[in-house]
Each structure stands twice: as structure tokens, then as C-alpha cells.
Design a protein with these regions (language model features):
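Feature recognizes metal-dependent phosphohydrolase scaffolds
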Residues: 3-331
């Protein structure tokens, strides 16, 4: 009887502990019940999450100190710091010459710019169709490789609506009962015959870049001496998965946007020192005409040699008048 009594006490304490735990977690359980209203739904999500954790870790891309250099940023973003070229070599290294692989990588980086150049080399309709076929099949193989780190559901969500079904078939088709080359050849041939090859090539290139990098991390200083930080911001706003750690130059621009006179003067000084003040006028609609008039009135005849802006020959040429106007406002 004593043993039974002790067992009952233990059971009561266990039940009390479980009840207290449920009560303590009730608010969390209530929130979970909104998305997973049944035991089956919760179990299904647990299984899906565990399966997702078994996949290879996605590539994370870190970039820092952009300083408004939009052209360098765009190239590094498009090439994923060499990840794209690595995937091209991994898929085609044994079968395709090095220069052809380099051209294909460049096509993936800049499809809209590179595609017309490569097409122009084809001297006949037959040669163009052959190039379309080879390029589409190679891009499909590369896309299949970069998608291997993701679930099929994730890849489907990344597909463009206009051609998502066909791309899904090309990426995930099974060939137990039919010939792979014949199946691909029929689909690719239909794409070319209907004049959609260019669109599919561009969409495949964009999809490869999307899937090649799972997350982008920006570490500080989007703004500074570079000419177009606004382009960088626009691209980051369209990126599928990015986080940003703001730098000291970014905080200065935020302060300027918030109306701090000190921050406004600092931003003006930096843009004038590097002859980037046109960005303030063209991209942010800030009129510097009044500043220029005041500067000409008080400093127009001064020695401005130490106030001359730093210039980049690649962005020139610069006239003497342009440099003078910038220097006098800088002073």
C-alpha cells in the first residue's frame, strides 16, 4: 500500500509538472495553432523542417565597404564572387573549351548585354538555332546543379510566372520511361521555333544567379565617395534575401535625410570632393544652384587649387568649368 501511495504521488507530481509546462507555454501553443491547427499539420511541418535541414547549406555571400561604387558592386553581385564561374566549370569543364565556358559565364552575369553579341556571330539561321540549342541545354544543366541545395518547392517559387511550368519540367523531369535527350530536344526545339529562346535564356541566367546565392550579407558603408549608391540601394531592395549592417557613412546619409545640418554639410562635402554632386541633383532632386551662386559670389576669384575634386578618368572628360564649379562649391 505504501508503494502504491508513493506511485500515486509521483504520477500526480508528473501530471502537475506537465500541466504547469502547458500553462507556461500556452501563449506560444496558441500562436502555433493558428498555422498548424491539428497534430497532423504540426507533424508534417516538423518532418518538412527536418528534411530541409538535411540539405547542403546554401551559399552565403558577404560584401563590405561598397562606398557607392555601383559598377564594381554589380559585377561582384552578378558573378557571386566567382561562384557562378565555379559552377560553370564544374558542369562543363570536361566537355567545353575554356573560352566557351568564360563566354557562358559572362552571359549568365549580363544576359541582356551579352546575348546580342553572341547571336551576332552566327552567320545563318541554322547556326543560330544550333547555338540556341547548345546554350539552353548548358544553362539547364548549370541551373540543375545550383538548384540541388534547395527543395523543389523553393525552386518552384523562384521560377518566373511566364515560363515557370516549362522550366520546372526541364529541371525536374524524370526519364525512367523515355529518352532524356529526345525529351529535352523536343522542348528546346519548340522554344526556338516559337521565338522564345531569348526570353528563356535570360530567365535561366537570372534563375541561376538567384539560386547560386542563398543569402547576401552587406557589411557597412553603402554610401561614401562612389558615384551611384542609389543604384546599389535599388538593387538591394529587389534582392530576394539580404541583410545589411550599416556603416558610419550610411549613418551620415541617414542623418542628412533626417535634416541634421552637420550631416547635410558632410554629405555635400564628400560628394563635391569626388565630383559626385550630380547624383544629388539627378537622383535625389536636390537643387544645388543656390549654393553655386553663393559660392561664385564669395569665392569665385579665390585660389581653388586645394579644393579641386578628385576625378576618375574613366568617368571623364571633365572641362575646366565643371571642375571650377565643383571646387568653388566645395570651398
Amino acid at each position: 500500500m505504501a508503494d502504491c501511495g508513493r506511485e500515486n504521488v509521483v504520477m500526480e507530481e508528473t501530471m502537475r509538472t506537465e500541466t504547469d509546462e502547458i500553462r507556461d507555454n500556452l501563449k506560444y501553443l496558441t500562436l502555433l495553432s493558428r498555422d498548424y491547427p491539428s497534430q497532423a499539420a504540426a507533424a508534417s511541418e516538423i518532418i518538412s523542417t527536418q528534411a530541409l535541414l538535411k540539405l547542403p547549406k546554401g551559399t552565403e555571400h558577404f560584401m563590405s565597404d561598397l562606398h557607392g561604387e555601383n559598377e564594381a558592386f554589380v559585377h561582384i553581385l552578378n558573378s557571386a564572387s566567382g561562384v557562378i564561374r565555379e559552377k560553370v566549370d564544374q558542369v562543363l569543364g570536361d566537355t567545353v573549351p575554356k573560352n566557351t565556358r568564360a563566354e557562358l559565364a559572362t552571359l549568365i552575369y549580363y544576359p541582356n548585354e551579352k546575348l546580342p553579341q553572341l547571336k551576332a556571330r552566327c552567320t545563318s539561321e541554322e547556326a543560330l538555332d544550333q547555338w540556341y540549342t547548345e546554350t539552353l541545354l548548358r544553362l539547364i544543366d548549370i541551373c540543375r546543379l545550383v538548384s540541388s541545395k534547395h527543395t523543389r518547392d523553393h525552386v518552384r517559387r523562384c521560377l518566373p510566372a511566364s515560363c515557370g511550368y516549362i522550366l520546372d519540367e526541364l529541371l525536374h523531369a524524370h526519364f525512367e520511361d523515355h529518352d532524356k535527350d529526345l525529351y529535352y530536344g523536343q522542348i528546346v526545339g519548340s522554344i526556338i521555333e516559337n521565338g522564345r529562346a531569348d526570353r528563356f535564356i535570360v530567365r535561366l541566367c537570372e534563375l541561376i544567379k538567384h539560386l547560386a546565392v542563398d543569402k547576401l550579407h552587406i557589411v557597412g558603408d553603402l554610401f561614401d565617395r562612389g558615384p551611384r549608391p542609389d543604384i546599389i540601394l535599388d538593387l538591394l531592395m529587389r534582392h530576394h534575401n539580404v541583410d545589411i549592417q550599416w556603416g558610419n557613412h550610411d549613418v551620415v546619409w541617414m542623418g542628412a535625410a533626417a535634416g541634421s545640418p552637420i550631416c547635410i554639410c558632410t554629405v555635400l562635402k564628400t560628394t563635391l570632393a569626388y565630383h559626385n554632386h550630380g547624383m544629388l541633383e539627378d537622383c535625389y532632386g536636390i537643387n544645388l544652384r543656390h549654393l553655386q551662386r553663393m559660392a561664385e559670389q564669395f569665392y569665385g576669384n579665390d585660389d581653388l587649387s586645394i579644393w579641386m575634386p578628385h576625378t576618375d578618368a574613366a568617368r571623364g572628360p571633365y572641362t575646366r568649368g565643371m571642375l571650377h564649379r565643383c571646387a568653388v562649391m566645395h570651398k
